[in-house]
């Protein structure tokens, strides 16, 4: 890799505010807020709305959407007459 052209890649904590879960990973994103992690070190923290801990697909709480009903409703409303 060329020196001096890549962004700083450092440990960051991503905190899921809806599931009250945090993940320590590496990223180029920066933050002015910090959090003390379980290992005793302080890391920048990024608050996010959805992660794998709260997304319905990953938690198994996905809802089935009635797309056929939506298509029929659309055709009734805007379809050919």
Curated annotation (Swiss-Prot):
A GO term, aspect molecular function: structural constituent of ribosome
Keywords noted in UniProt: Ribonucleoprotein, Ribosomal protein
Gene3D superfamilies: Ribosomal protein L31
Signal peptide annotation: none
NCBIfam families, alphabetized: L31 (TIGR00105), PRK01678.1 (NF002462)
Family as reported in the entry's similarity comment: Belongs to the bacterial ribosomal protein bL31 family. Type B subfamily.
Subunit structure: Part of the 50S ribosomal subunit.
Identification of the protein by name: Large ribosomal subunit protein bL31B
Organism: Cutibacterium acnes (strain DSM 16379 / KPA171202)
Organism classification: Bacteria, Bacillati, Actinomycetota, Actinomycetes, Propionibacteriales
């Amino acid at each position: 890799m060329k020196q001096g052209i890549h962004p700083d890649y450092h440990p960051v904590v991503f905190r899921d505010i809806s599931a009250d879960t945090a993940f320590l990973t590496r990223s180029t994103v920066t933050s002015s807020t910090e959090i003390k992690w379980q290992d005793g070190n302080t890391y920048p923290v990024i608050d996010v709305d959805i992660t794998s801990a709260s997304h319905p697909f990953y938690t198994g709480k996905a809802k089935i959407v009635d797309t056929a009903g939506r298509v029929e409703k659309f055709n009734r409303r805007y379809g050919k007459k």
